[in-house]
Amino acid sequence: MNRRALISVSDKTGVVDFARGLADLGFEIVSTGGTYQTIKAAGVPVTYVTEITGFPEILDGRVKTLHPKVHGGILARRTPEHLAQLEAHAIVPIDVVAVNLYPFRETVAKPGVTREEAVENIDIGGPAMVRASAKNHESVAIIVNPDRYATVLAELQQNGVVSEATRRALAREAFAHTAEYDAAIAAYLAAEAGDDDPFAGIFAPGKVEKVQDLRYGENPHQKAAFYRERGYRGAGAGTAKQRWGKELSFNNLLDLNAALELVREFDRPAAAIIKHNNPCGVAVAATLKEAYEKAFAADPVSAFGGIIAFNVAVDADTANEVVKTFMEAVIAPSFDEAALEILQQKKGLRIMETGPLADSAPATADVKKIRGGFLVQEADLGDVTAEQIQVVTERAPEEGELADLLFAWKVVKHVKSNAIVIAKDGVAIGVGAGQMNRVGSAQIALEQAKASRAFGGDSVDHNNPAQGAVLASDAFLPFKDTVETAARYGIRAIIQPGGSVRDAESIEACNRLGVAMVFTGMRHFKH
């Protein structure tokens, strides 16, 4: 018995050559409508679908392939039981299916398209065949993209079969194809009905669930909503449980996420305070209370009204410090009952509980929206160890300096570029963010560090906490000016990616000024 292929496509690109190639391999080609006419006109043997179903097309072509002799041939496993049932009903197995769907998107994009035209371009039989073939991909190769014809033909010519790996890949593409198709239809119908949800149709159905409309977006004149990724069960700002406080705002959620992702970096108890998506205080310490006190003292003016994140359970001692100042929200893996009671004294404080951070799978994708499209990249999970850095100066960093360099390197990754972080004794005492030149960010960070009260009177030089501190830069130093500026404030060591054509000038300046410098070979731009 010859093998059978079913071809029914709206996009005729390459279909004649594909059908001819299959026919040359002994396949019986079954087709419908315009595809049948195209293949027949090219002189390729082809059977009209009604010849195998014994049933005519009806309802103006709305029903053509919805028949057991089509779907039975597609869905049958190649087991003795299924094959016996096919034989009993004179059904031939179908091994290859090439289908792409009515051009719904193209139709509704036309100016003046009517609802009737749109509805008539909602494909029914096509998606049914695509999904049936994809479900039975153990036995059937389903092609929804003409670019795949050559791959399938090549494997059939070389091996007589389509490989399991290719069939699985084709099935994934097929389900994505029908999901996108359904999403386009849902978006059109929502818009046509005057749905007042401005975000209807942005996401593919089933990918996300709408949690709530937000009061507004970044600004009061912007509408906003919060969606949660379906299936994600890890600890994150999007899955955290609100234990107390007012409704979350758009900006709250952005800052909660930024704060939580920062404290994930650390194994020791850590606290981070975020304002406008940038850290204004970060610290690690032996206790959470100490970490929070130092993070807050680093820049108490900026910390007011901020978002706090902790990487371990919040205890009563820490909670007592938090409630001394107005804060928007706090997020942590958990809260002791005593800590929760203390924090709830602040009626407006939003308290968010994530569960253990260790339970989370690493983030895999970072998505940004641009007008007319999306940009997708791997999440920035890069880090370096003491063994991986390269000391490039005559003086190597001392043990304490090295610990601070690695701490600052973790923090600077979470600061808007151009980013500079000044750190000392496990505290970020100065942050320069978002400046268009690097020395400008350094100047801001160094002035903040000089004014920091993270160490109070216990500082080596409490009039200049920057003395003896370290500096981290998210990208290479293009000129020696940052080194020279840092040295004037008492910076003793610098960590940066390296890679500038003027690295030698920065290294020479460090050697001249007694500053240690290490290269990571890794950049951490954040836009």
Swiss-Prot record:
Quote the InterPro entries the UniProt record gives. AICAR_Tfase_dup_dom_sf, Cytidine_deaminase-like, MGS-like_dom, MGS-like_dom_sf, PurH-like
**Molecular-function GO terms, alphabetical:** IMP cyclohydrolase activity; phosphoribosylaminoimidazolecarboxamide formyltransferase activity
SUPFAM superfamilies (alphabetical): Cytidine deaminase-like, Methylglyoxal synthase-like
| Metabolic or biological pathway, per its Swiss-Prot or TrEMBL entry | Purine metabolism; IMP biosynthesis via de novo pathway; 5-formamido-1-(5-phospho-D-ribosyl)imidazole-4-carboxamide from 5-amino-1-(5-phospho-D-ribosyl)imidazole-4-carboxamide (10-formyl THF route): step 1/1; Purine metabolism; IMP biosynthesis via de novo pathway; IMP from 5-formamido-1-(5-phospho-D-ribosyl)imidazole-4-carboxamide: step 1/1
MGS-like domain: residues covered: 1-144
An example Gene Ontology cellular component term from the record?
cytosol
What EC numbers are recorded for this enzyme?
2.1.2.3, 3.5.4.10
* Key words of the record: Hydrolase, Multifunctional enzyme, Purine biosynthesis, Transferase
Check the record and name the Pfam families matching this protein. Answer: AICARFT_IMPCHas, MGS
KW Hydrolase (keyword) present: yes
Which biological process, per GO, is one annotated for this protein? 'de novo' IMP biosynthetic process
Catalytic activity, reaction form: (6R)-10-formyltetrahydrofolate + 5-amino-1-(5-phospho-beta-D-ribosyl)imidazole-4-carboxamide = 5-formamido-1-(5-phospho-D-ribosyl)imidazole-4-carboxamide + (6S)-5,6,7,8-tetrahydrofolate; IMP + H2O = 5-formamido-1-(5-phospho-D-ribosyl)imidazole-4-carboxamide
Under PROSITE patterns, the record lists: MGS (PS51855)
The UniProt entry, under Gene3D superfamilies, shows: 3.40.140.20, Methylglyoxal synthase-like domain
Q: Record's CDD domains? A: IMPCH
NCBIfam families associated with the record:
PRK00881.1, purH
User: How does the record comment on the protein's domains?
Assistant: The IMP cyclohydrolase activity resides in the N-terminal region.
What family name appears in the similarity comment? Belongs to the PurH family.
Please identify the protein, giving its name as recorded: Bifunctional purine biosynthesis protein PurH
| Native organism | Heliobacterium modesticaldum (strain ATCC 51547 / Ice1)
Per the record, the gene is purH
